[in-house]
Amino acid sequence: MPKVLIVHDYLNQVGGGEKVLELLLKLFINAEVYTLTWDRKLFPKINPKTSFIQFIPLKKRYRAYMPLFPTAVKLLKIPENSLILSSSHAYIKNIIKPKNSLHICYCLTPMRYAWDSRSEYLKRENVFLRPFIALFLAYLRHWDKKGSENVDYFIAIS
């Protein structure tokens, strides 16, 4: 029997995606949870495996660490022979799928700031940082497209 893993972008805010995660945890009570960063106060009943982002100071300003998120996802070690259920709106669906594993992604929404809303996103950023952010978003689109090829099945709600 494969080990069930639930992977979620980050657990530092409460929203619709986190409600989906709670439902998945009710369905798969023995599942292990993986995430990039976790706020214990918001999610005291979940004890996830986290990325190195968890240990960076000023986690509340996680947007400043966005360029590190693809590397953080890549470095999360997933055991072989796993059933990976990702609940994702951004990064975690690109987790590296090990041998003999199945990855089903419950895609909450595409990474809109990298795809269809990038011009609106850039308008809100510092004018001097925009060229660098635009380059990062181009890289992110490439990484997102390539990473989605490792998902076996998508379930989309948005």
Tell me the role of every PLM-derived stretch.
Residues 88-89, 109, 155-158:
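Helix N-cap/beta->alpha junction signal
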Residues 27-93:
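Active-site donor-binding segments of glycosyltransferases and PAPS-dependent sulfotransferases
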Residues 5-8, 56-61, 125-133:
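Short, basic, glycine/proline-bearing loop/turn elements
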Residues 83-85, 97-126:
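Active-site proximal beta-strand in glycosyltransferases
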Residues 123, 129-154:
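Membrane-proximal helix-turn-helix segments that form the acceptor-binding/catalytic region
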Residues 2-12, 36-37:
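Nucleotide-activated donor-dependent transferases that construct or modify glycoconjugates
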Residues 13, 41-43, 92-96, 112-115:
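Short catalytic/ligand-binding loop motif for oxyanion handling, primarily in non-cytosolic enzymes
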Residues 17-27:
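Short amphipathic alpha-helix
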